[in-house]
Amino acid sequence: MDKQKAIAITTEIFELYTRYGSSDYIGEPVSQLEHMCQAAQMAAAEGADDEMVLAAFFHDIGHLCEFIMPLEKMEGIGIVDHESIGEEYLLSHGFSPRLGRLVQGHVPAKRYLTFKYPEYYQRLSQASKETLTIQGGVMQADEAAAFEADPLFADYIKMREWDDRAKLVNTPIPDLDFLKEMAIQHLMNQN
């Protein structure tokens, strides 16, 4: 992709964050923008590659898509299938299939972890517990086996870990320029 198109797409996507990111994050103690910035910062601090850092930042973009398209809501706790909506949105804008799959994979990772480690459920925020049922509930053994066999399995689990931890109050929002530049470079590297 050429640089001008990559800049235009990045500007469009980051405009979603600037315009709507300060909105309520489905009952969590932080805004959507704070949550997604924290997830990206955690990924970067742990040495994740650029696709993982961007996926951590974009993992809940499906919730922001409600402001640009009609979407089904989960009774005040977010957007139904936000993970798939986010994946489709990013793919349609030229992001890599791996990045899209990482965004999509953070919800199945929650379902998997509640299957594999029943105590994990107790660590979920109230909002995350409420959405779990709508998102398919605890995985069944056959689903879990297939999920474990996915080549991105370990990355999905990391994405979920950052998602769970990225709810710290009073954490300043960083300058988004480093993420914008990362997104532009990522898009320019796509065919």
Predicted regions and their residues:
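Metal-dependent phosphohydrolase cores
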Residues: 1-191
